[in-house]
Regions:
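N-terminal beta-loop-helix "entrance" segment that forms/cooperates
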Residues: 35-54
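Histidine-anchored nucleotide/phosphate-binding helix
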Residues: 22
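Active-site-adjacent pocket-lining segments in enzyme domains
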Residues: 4-8, 13-16, 27-36, 55, ...
Length: 191
């Protein structure tokens, strides 16, 4: 059975943190719905890139039809998502049903607002740790996986964030195969 992912975005979201994980999830043949949190047909990213969505938030009748809920960071996109009561409720519902919840960069503030990070290790873009309720903040790891919660630091690790989502959902060699196909190991010697 194909795993389904709800990928929410709002105006001012970081485009790289949206597109890189989306690309990797679709390479892994996950069914990903790109959904506007503001109920528009498109959003404008933090760097003025227009992103056409698959669905609007009001189209979602039951968030539990998804296996994961994911959001990119960026500002003011993360703040808009945090201030969206429906997004907060979706995150609470998914987390309480032990489904995957994932956020990158500034977006872990949404998980914190939903009460998800209290007992979880987490990371975020530097400086946002002060807004998180995580009892175990990790500033050294690019991506943190703690049970059904994945957090990541920012744009440079968006690809790794996508791999971890795929790895969590599929629990097979798919993520590693995609890493090889995308030449990620080449970076090891070049950064």
């Amino acid at each position: 059975m194909t795993k389904k992912v709800a990928l929410f975005v709002d105006n001012g979201g970081e485009e790289l943190e949206l597109i890189a994980p989306l690309d990797i999830m679709r390479r892994a043949n996950l069914e990903v719905d790109l959904i506007s949190a503001n109920n528009a047909e498109y959003v404008i990213g933090a760097h003025n890139i227009k992103i056409i969505v698959d669905k609007k938030i009001n189209d979602i009748e039951d968030i539990l039809e998804y296996d994961a809920i994911v959001i990119p960071g960026g500002m003011p996109g993360s703040t808009l998502l945090r201030n969206n009561n429906k997004i907060i409720e979706f995150f609470k519902t998914m987390y309480n049903e032990d489904k995957l919840v994932a956020a990158i960069c500034a977006a872990p503030i949404v998980l914190s607002a939903a009460g998800i990070l209290k007992d979880r290790e987490a990371t975020s873009y530097p400086g946002f740790d002060k807004e998180l309720e995580s009892q175990s903040y990790n500033s050294k790891k690019a991506v943190v996986v703690d049970k059904n919660v994945i957090t990541a630091q920012g744009p440079a690790v968006a690809i790794l964030f996508g791999y971890e989502i795929v790895n969590y959902l599929l629990k097979d060699e798919t993520a590693n195969n995609i890493k090889e196909q995308m030449l990620l190991p080449v970076l090891k010697d070049n950064i």
